Amino acid sequence: MTPIKILFISIEGNTRSFVKDLTKYAVGMHDQDATNPLVESKEISDQSDFENETQPYFVFVPTYLDGGNGIDNGVKELMTNTMGEYIGYEHNADLCHGIVGSGNRNFNEQYCLTAKRYASRFNVPFLADYELRGTGRDVERIYKLLAAG
């Protein structure tokens, strides 16, 4: 089975923690049944060299915004811009199979807004969301979704 490839950016460690938990969960599922895919991940940061992706992948991105309410009075993405630039590099967007977003529900309409904007910008599905570091149920739910797709 081909591994699930994930590109992610993590600012405060929540996304990194979730991807780590997802990777561990995948190992357990694969140990139970070798047809269950493993997870391979690559962290994108401001220090990353842009590369041409060669395999389909999913993107995990948190939301950090400055000002505006995200709907009618503007939005300014903070700290995650490099991920958007990486997806847009060369033909990388062609291999993106969807976006998973995270954030804090306290921000209402801004919750997962970066992921939703990337999905629209790159014409790929917004697949799922989880809050902050996610829960075990989130890990299971998102693994099943990515493994099926």
Language model regions located:
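N-terminal beta1-alpha1-beta2 submodule of the flavodoxin-like/Rossmannoid cofactor-binding fold
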Residues: 1-76, 80-81
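FMN-binding flavodoxin-like domain, especially the glycine-rich phosphate-binding loop
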Residues: 55-149
